[in-house]
Regions:
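Extended, subdomain-level signal for the structured scaffold at the beginning of enzyme domains
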Residues: 1-72, 156-158, 164-167, 176-184
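Active-site-proximal beta-strand elements of phosphoester/diester hydrolases
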Residues: 5, 167-171, 233-236
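Hydrophobic anchor at the start of a short beta-strand
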Residues: 30-31, 96, 232
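Cysteine-nucleophile active-site neighborhood
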Residues: 64-153
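Pocket-forming structural segment of enzyme catalytic cores
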Residues: 112-219
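Beta-strand-turn-beta hairpins that frame and shape the catalytic cleft
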Residues: 162-165, 227-232
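Short, surface-exposed beta-strand/loop micro-motifs that present aromatic residues
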Residues: 221-227
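Single conserved hydrophobic/aromatic residue that forms the stacking wall/gate
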Residues: 237, 241-246
Protein backbone atom coordinates (compact mmCIF):
# COMPACT_ATOMS: atom_id res chain seq x y z
CA UNK A 1 0.00 0.00 0.00
CA UNK A 2 1.34 3.42 -0.96
CA UNK A 3 1.98 5.85 1.91
CA UNK A 4 -0.56 8.69 1.98
CA UNK A 5 0.99 12.13 2.27
CA UNK A 6 -0.72 15.37 3.29
CA UNK A 7 1.04 18.43 1.84
CA UNK A 8 -0.39 21.34 3.79
CA UNK A 9 -0.92 24.73 2.21
CA UNK A 10 -2.48 28.06 3.06
CA UNK A 11 -2.32 31.52 1.51
CA UNK A 12 1.34 32.30 0.82
CA UNK A 13 2.56 28.71 0.46
CA UNK A 14 4.33 28.43 -2.90
CA UNK A 15 6.29 25.15 -2.93
CA UNK A 16 3.45 22.68 -2.57
CA UNK A 17 3.48 21.62 -6.24
CA UNK A 18 7.20 20.77 -6.40
CA UNK A 19 6.80 18.85 -3.13
CA UNK A 20 3.81 16.97 -4.54
CA UNK A 21 5.74 16.06 -7.70
CA UNK A 22 8.75 14.90 -5.69
CA UNK A 23 6.65 12.42 -3.73
CA UNK A 24 4.74 11.38 -6.85
CA UNK A 25 8.03 10.43 -8.53
CA UNK A 26 8.81 8.27 -5.51
CA UNK A 27 5.54 6.40 -6.00
CA UNK A 28 3.75 7.84 -2.98
CA UNK A 29 0.11 8.90 -2.89
CA UNK A 30 0.35 12.62 -2.14
CA UNK A 31 -2.40 15.22 -1.85
CA UNK A 32 -2.19 19.00 -1.53
CA UNK A 33 -4.54 19.91 1.31
CA UNK A 34 -5.60 23.41 2.35
CA UNK A 35 -5.69 24.12 6.08
CA UNK A 36 -9.42 24.86 5.80
CA UNK A 37 -9.99 21.27 4.67
CA UNK A 38 -8.46 19.98 7.92
CA UNK A 39 -10.44 22.53 9.94
CA UNK A 40 -13.70 21.35 8.35
CA UNK A 41 -14.79 24.79 7.16
CA UNK A 42 -15.37 23.65 3.57
CA UNK A 43 -17.99 21.54 1.82
CA UNK A 44 -18.24 18.06 3.30
CA UNK A 45 -16.80 16.33 0.22
CA UNK A 46 -13.67 18.50 0.49
CA UNK A 47 -12.99 17.84 4.18
CA UNK A 48 -9.91 15.90 5.21
CA UNK A 49 -8.54 14.46 8.46
CA UNK A 50 -4.94 13.88 9.49
CA UNK A 51 -6.02 10.35 10.40
CA UNK A 52 -6.24 9.64 6.66
CA UNK A 53 -2.50 10.20 6.14
CA UNK A 54 0.82 8.61 7.07
CA UNK A 55 3.01 11.69 6.61
CA UNK A 56 2.43 15.42 7.06
CA UNK A 57 4.52 17.87 5.04
CA UNK A 58 4.63 21.64 5.52
CA UNK A 59 6.38 22.96 2.39
CA UNK A 60 8.21 26.19 1.68
CA UNK A 61 6.80 29.60 0.94
CA UNK A 62 5.61 32.63 2.87
CA UNK A 63 2.61 31.34 4.81
CA UNK A 64 0.23 34.20 5.64
CA UNK A 65 2.80 36.54 4.13
CA UNK A 66 5.22 35.78 6.99
CA UNK A 67 3.74 38.73 8.84
CA UNK A 68 4.84 39.09 12.48
CA UNK A 69 7.58 36.46 11.96
CA UNK A 70 8.22 33.78 9.40
CA UNK A 71 5.79 30.93 10.05
CA UNK A 72 4.28 32.51 13.17
CA UNK A 73 0.70 32.86 11.93
CA UNK A 74 0.41 29.36 10.49
CA UNK A 75 2.01 27.96 13.65
CA UNK A 76 -0.59 29.72 15.80
CA UNK A 77 -3.46 28.53 13.60
CA UNK A 78 -2.30 24.91 13.66
CA UNK A 79 -1.55 24.97 17.37
CA UNK A 80 -4.88 26.56 18.24
CA UNK A 81 -7.18 24.54 16.00
CA UNK A 82 -5.35 21.26 15.35
CA UNK A 83 -3.24 20.81 18.47
CA UNK A 84 -4.96 17.60 19.56
CA UNK A 85 -4.88 16.11 16.06
CA UNK A 86 -1.18 16.92 15.67
CA UNK A 87 -0.44 15.38 19.08
CA UNK A 88 -2.32 12.20 18.13
CA UNK A 89 -0.58 12.08 14.73
CA UNK A 90 2.85 12.30 16.37
CA UNK A 91 1.89 9.95 19.19
CA UNK A 92 0.97 7.29 16.63
CA UNK A 93 4.52 7.50 15.28
CA UNK A 94 3.67 9.25 12.02
CA UNK A 95 6.48 11.35 10.54
CA UNK A 96 6.39 15.08 9.78
CA UNK A 97 8.56 16.97 7.30
CA UNK A 98 9.01 20.74 7.42
CA UNK A 99 10.81 22.40 4.51
CA UNK A 100 12.06 25.99 4.88
CA UNK A 101 8.85 27.78 5.93
CA UNK A 102 7.75 24.45 7.38
CA UNK A 103 10.89 24.49 9.54
CA UNK A 104 9.94 27.96 10.74
CA UNK A 105 6.35 26.91 11.48
CA UNK A 106 7.24 23.82 13.51
CA UNK A 107 9.91 25.60 15.54
CA UNK A 108 7.39 28.36 16.27
CA UNK A 109 4.99 25.67 17.50
CA UNK A 110 7.58 24.40 19.96
CA UNK A 111 7.69 20.92 18.40
CA UNK A 112 11.43 21.06 17.83
CA UNK A 113 14.08 20.74 19.10
CA UNK A 114 11.65 18.91 21.42
CA UNK A 115 13.64 18.68 24.64
CA UNK A 116 11.92 17.71 27.86
CA UNK A 117 8.43 16.51 26.94
CA UNK A 118 7.06 13.29 25.44
CA UNK A 119 6.43 13.66 21.69
CA UNK A 120 2.64 13.77 21.95
CA UNK A 121 2.84 16.81 24.27
CA UNK A 122 5.39 18.92 22.42
CA UNK A 123 2.88 21.05 20.58
CA UNK A 124 2.23 22.83 23.89
CA UNK A 125 5.90 23.23 24.77
CA UNK A 126 7.53 26.63 25.08
CA UNK A 127 9.51 27.60 22.00
CA UNK A 128 13.11 26.44 22.45
CA UNK A 129 14.74 27.85 19.31
CA UNK A 130 14.00 30.32 16.54
CA UNK A 131 14.81 31.15 12.95
CA UNK A 132 15.80 34.80 12.74
CA UNK A 133 16.86 37.28 10.07
CA UNK A 134 19.90 36.30 8.01
CA UNK A 135 23.16 37.93 9.09
CA UNK A 136 23.35 39.48 5.62
CA UNK A 137 19.98 41.19 6.26
CA UNK A 138 18.80 40.13 2.82
CA UNK A 139 17.03 37.30 1.03
CA UNK A 140 19.54 34.56 0.17
CA UNK A 141 18.66 32.48 -2.89
CA UNK A 142 21.32 30.24 -4.48
CA UNK A 143 22.80 26.73 -4.51
CA UNK A 144 24.13 25.69 -1.10
CA UNK A 145 26.33 22.83 0.06
CA UNK A 146 25.16 20.79 3.03
CA UNK A 147 26.75 17.80 4.74
CA UNK A 148 24.69 14.92 6.09
CA UNK A 149 25.65 14.69 9.78
CA UNK A 150 23.11 12.24 11.16
CA UNK A 151 24.30 8.87 12.48
CA UNK A 152 21.05 7.05 11.72
CA UNK A 153 18.45 8.50 14.07
CA UNK A 154 16.50 10.45 11.42
CA UNK A 155 14.14 8.14 9.53
CA UNK A 156 14.11 10.45 6.50
CA UNK A 157 17.86 10.27 5.82
CA UNK A 158 18.84 6.73 6.82
CA UNK A 159 19.65 5.99 3.18
CA UNK A 160 22.17 8.84 2.97
CA UNK A 161 25.77 8.12 3.95
CA UNK A 162 27.02 10.14 6.91
CA UNK A 163 29.40 12.80 5.60
CA UNK A 164 27.79 12.92 2.16
CA UNK A 165 27.81 16.45 0.72
CA UNK A 166 24.72 17.53 -1.20
CA UNK A 167 24.15 20.56 -3.40
CA UNK A 168 20.74 22.01 -2.66
CA UNK A 169 19.00 25.37 -3.18
CA UNK A 170 18.38 27.83 -0.37
CA UNK A 171 15.79 30.62 -0.53
CA UNK A 172 15.05 32.47 2.69
CA UNK A 173 15.34 35.77 4.53
CA UNK A 174 14.82 34.39 8.05
CA UNK A 175 16.95 31.27 8.13
CA UNK A 176 19.40 31.78 10.97
CA UNK A 177 18.98 28.96 13.49
CA UNK A 178 19.17 30.66 16.87
CA UNK A 179 19.08 29.66 20.54
CA UNK A 180 19.09 32.23 23.32
CA UNK A 181 22.52 32.68 24.87
CA UNK A 182 21.85 31.31 28.36
CA UNK A 183 20.60 28.00 26.91
CA UNK A 184 22.79 27.83 23.83
CA UNK A 185 25.65 25.62 25.00
CA UNK A 186 23.35 23.11 26.71
CA UNK A 187 20.88 22.88 23.82
CA UNK A 188 23.59 22.50 21.18
CA UNK A 189 25.12 19.69 23.24
CA UNK A 190 21.73 18.01 23.52
CA UNK A 191 21.29 18.20 19.75
CA UNK A 192 24.66 16.47 19.34
CA UNK A 193 24.08 13.87 22.07
CA UNK A 194 20.59 12.99 20.79
CA UNK A 195 21.77 12.71 17.16
CA UNK A 196 19.32 15.45 16.17
CA UNK A 197 21.57 17.39 13.81
CA UNK A 198 20.84 16.21 10.28
CA UNK A 199 22.46 18.76 7.91
CA UNK A 200 25.16 21.41 8.28
CA UNK A 201 26.37 24.05 5.83
CA UNK A 202 29.88 23.42 4.47
CA UNK A 203 32.28 24.74 1.84
CA UNK A 204 33.42 22.70 -1.22
CA UNK A 205 36.04 20.92 0.93
CA UNK A 206 33.36 19.78 3.37
CA UNK A 207 34.56 22.14 6.10
CA UNK A 208 32.22 24.18 8.27
CA UNK A 209 32.57 27.73 7.01
CA UNK A 210 31.00 31.14 7.45
CA UNK A 211 29.24 33.32 4.85
CA UNK A 212 28.67 32.79 1.97
CA UNK A 213 28.79 29.02 2.54
CA UNK A 214 26.62 29.43 5.61
CA UNK A 215 24.03 31.68 3.95
CA UNK A 216 22.36 32.93 7.11
CA UNK A 217 24.76 32.69 10.06
CA UNK A 218 23.05 29.68 11.67
CA UNK A 219 24.49 28.53 14.98
CA UNK A 220 26.90 25.63 14.53
CA UNK A 221 26.19 25.80 10.76
CA UNK A 222 22.92 23.94 11.31
CA UNK A 223 20.73 23.53 8.21
CA UNK A 224 18.48 20.70 9.38
CA UNK A 225 17.45 19.02 12.62
CA UNK A 226 15.14 16.23 13.73
CA UNK A 227 13.30 15.45 16.96
CA UNK A 228 14.87 13.05 19.51
CA UNK A 229 12.84 10.16 18.03
CA UNK A 230 13.99 10.98 14.49
CA UNK A 231 10.46 11.10 13.09
CA UNK A 232 10.23 14.86 12.46
CA UNK A 233 12.72 16.43 10.05
CA UNK A 234 13.08 20.17 9.60
CA UNK A 235 15.22 21.28 6.67
CA UNK A 236 15.86 24.91 5.85
CA UNK A 237 17.15 23.82 2.44
CA UNK A 238 14.59 23.13 -0.31
CA UNK A 239 15.21 19.39 -0.54
CA UNK A 240 12.21 18.87 -2.84
CA UNK A 241 13.20 21.41 -5.49
CA UNK A 242 16.07 19.47 -7.16
CA UNK A 243 13.54 16.80 -8.23
CA UNK A 244 11.69 19.31 -10.40
CA UNK A 245 12.40 19.04 -14.17
CA UNK A 246 13.43 22.18 -16.03
Amino acid sequence: MKPRICILRIEGTNCELETFLAFKRLGASAEIVHLKQLLGVVKERERRSLKDYNLLVIPGGFSSGDYIRAGAILAARIKGALGTEIADFIGDGNPILGICNGFQVLVEMGLLPGFGAPPEEREIEMQQAALTTNDSARFECRPTLIKHENKGNCVFTQGITKGCILKMPCAHAEGKFFIEEQKRERYLQLLEDNDQIVFRYVDPEGTYASYPWNPNGSLSNIAGICNPEGTILLSLIHISEPTRPY
